[in-house]
Amino acid sequence: MLGKVITVANQKGGVGKTTTAVNLSACLAALGKQVLIVDIDPQGNATSGLGINKADVRYCIYDVLINDISPIDATLPTEIEGLQIIPATIQLAGAEIELVPTISREVRLKRALEVIKDKYDYVIIDCPPSLGILTVNSLTASDSVLIPIQCEYYALEGLSQLLNTIRLVQKHLNNQLAIEGVLLTMLDARTNLGIQVIEEVKKYFQDKVYRTIIPRNVRLSEAPSHGQAIISYDPRSRGAEVYTDLAKEVVGI
């Protein structure tokens, strides 16, 4: 197996980060890949968005990071063939503080994933919307980072902090970390603003910007409340189409 680890990160909330982590993972699995999604966001939206009832979870990513539970024991199946998840529960909210005195705290996730990543073609990590120790763990454990950017006026605001964090991780913790790509999300095709943002982001990131752009899509925003990825909830929707296109870009088809 390829065992490629990709973190989906942006410390700005509401940019389509979890939507992208869930639907990219599901679409990679639909292409026949073996995929693990790791939910490391205390809100646990990727977990509930894939239909996992948090009350039924025995072990989550918190147990892996803090209690040295094997990631194999924390992995659960989803309704999508080829897609498994290490879930997050509210316990994870305390992990940032609990990790502070821990030796080698930045590499806890990296060490855990080394045990299992070769069982998968792709491991996709859904980060919290912050640049704390959980995000640093994710970047340290990853081969690359995928950055979703919303097509809005302040699109690039705050990105310098994320890019600076990536540079620090590259320098001190993971010199192999690369930018996988930049994904434009929530495009409203009716506005000129979206077109301006696309041009601005392409000027800044050049060939790192994916050809696929995620539009605003009602079905895409409805799917998580049904505990389903878009390809399960409405496989014929525009949302399913564009995330399938993104998965093909990531794979190189």
What do these predicted ranges mean?
Residues 1-253:
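P-loop NTP-binding core
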